[in-house]
Amino acid sequence: MAEFSQKRGKRRGDEGLGSMVDFLLANARLVLGVGGAAVLGIATLAVKRFIDRATSPRDEDDTKADSWKELSLLKATPHLQPRPPPAALSQPVLPLAPSSSAPEGPAKSDPEVTPQLSSPAPLCLTLQERLLAFERDRVTIPAAQVALAKQLAGDIALELQAYFQSKFPELPFGAFVPGGPLYDGLQAGAADHVRLLVPLVLEPGLWSLVPGVDTVARDPRCWAVRRTQLEFCPRGSSPWDRFLVGGYLSSRVLLELLRKVLAASVNWPAIGSLLGCLIRPSMASEELLLEVQHERLELTVAVLVAVPGVDADDRLLLAWPLEGLAGNLWLQDLYPVEAARLRALDDRDAGTRRRLLLLLCAVCRGCSALGQLGRGHLTQVVLRLGEDNVDWTEEALGERFLQALELLIGSLEQASLPCHFNPSVNLFSNLREEEIDDIGYALYSGLQEPEGLL
């Protein structure tokens, strides 16, 4: 009975409090409007429930239910902007920002009210715009660095030639000439080597060239330098006869000699101190490489022993670390004719073939799966495309880029990329099947989404 009286008294108290709430809400609608009355009602209800929780214990389940209901009710309540002061009523009122919790659906709105955007929409760049941005950020080299690299390479060439003249006074060398992509405007970033040619001066009439396919190596990339006129000029008449192997000038013997000289004989610390840089011969590579470190840049100088202009075609042959039966042969260097042909094609129609080559080189260097594609492969692709009479203006650079990817994929499917100047040479012959598959997959993915390569 006492418990019933307690509940009844509580109910009466609730009825009195409820009447007071109703009275406040009824008058609040007139003063504050519907929205203000709703806020006042929720606040009053929260105070009432707080008093109820303090005066009577409640079940845990009921407490949890009321809690998430109140939370959802508060989330669903629109946040009203404060009313402007009376003095500002004549001023234009800014539109209210839409609430993120407002229910979705069609709603009538004033056509003069424009939504306020918090941040601008992201720009959608075209492939052409992305290529130009990639070229600016990843391909172009500052002119100051180019000038410094040329100066260092020229100084190293002079110092090295002076040393060779003192070390081998009996061997006639030509002028040590630095060159390569850096000097031809074909340098893609700082990864390309500076080519330092060390030409051999051979006596006219004592030497002739034999195609590599006519030797035991059967290699169309190479040539053999044969000693002739032995009956009139016996062996020993030429200072280069000391490098003969089986009647042929051996590139391997010359490479071994120069490797020992560059690694152990040249005083690189003294030369580096004189030039203001650090010079170290690379011992890890089979090529003759010099690593140059300057406070403003780093570059690699490739020392290339060359045999120039032995025949009427003025071929340039390099002593290259070849394997097997071709170890004593000389590799034909196609870089000079490739660079000259690209320059001639671009000059003919003010084209962008060389820019396309630089973009492809930078893209392949930036993707590990495409690292096997070197400058030689990409140059052949651009040359094949460049001979076509199509649009080579800057506006068509994106289209030519995709066309180059398609040509590479087609060549990989056939595992064949013929040399532009010697179709019997397949530039993909040294790639394994697994490498071809990896490169092809990366290129196919890049063709579907070219932006992923940039």
From Swiss-Prot:
Membrane topology: Single-pass membrane protein
Region (Disordered): 76-119
Residue ranges that the UniProt entry lists as topological domain Mitochondrial intermembrane: 1-22
Residue spans of biased composition, Low complexity class: 88-108
Tagged with keyword Membrane: yes
One annotated Gene Ontology cellular component of this protein: mitochondrion
Transmembrane segment boundaries: 23-43
Example of a GO biological process term: positive regulation of protein targeting to membrane
Compartmental location: Mitochondrion outer membrane
Keyword set includes Mitochondrion: yes
Coarse class of the protein's main subcellular location: mitochondrion
Alphabetical list of Gene3D superfamilies matching this protein: 1.10.1410.40, 3.30.460.90
Cytoplasmic side: 44-454
Keyword terms: Membrane, Mitochondrion, Mitochondrion outer membrane, Transmembrane, Transmembrane helix
Record-linked InterPro entries: Mab-21_HhH/H2TH-like, MAB21L/cGLR, MID49/MID51, MID51-like_C
Family note: Belongs to the MID49/MID51 family.
Its job: Mitochondrial outer membrane protein which regulates mitochondrial organization. It is required for mitochondrial fission and promotes the recruitment and association of the fission mediator dynamin-related protein 1 (DNM1L) to the mitochondrial surface independently of the mitochondrial fission FIS1 and MFF proteins. Regulates DNM1L GTPase activity.
Assembly with partners or alone: Interacts with DNM1L.
Misc. remarks from the entry: Does not bind ADP or other nucleotides, in contrast to MIEF1.
Protein name (record): Mitochondrial dynamics protein MID49
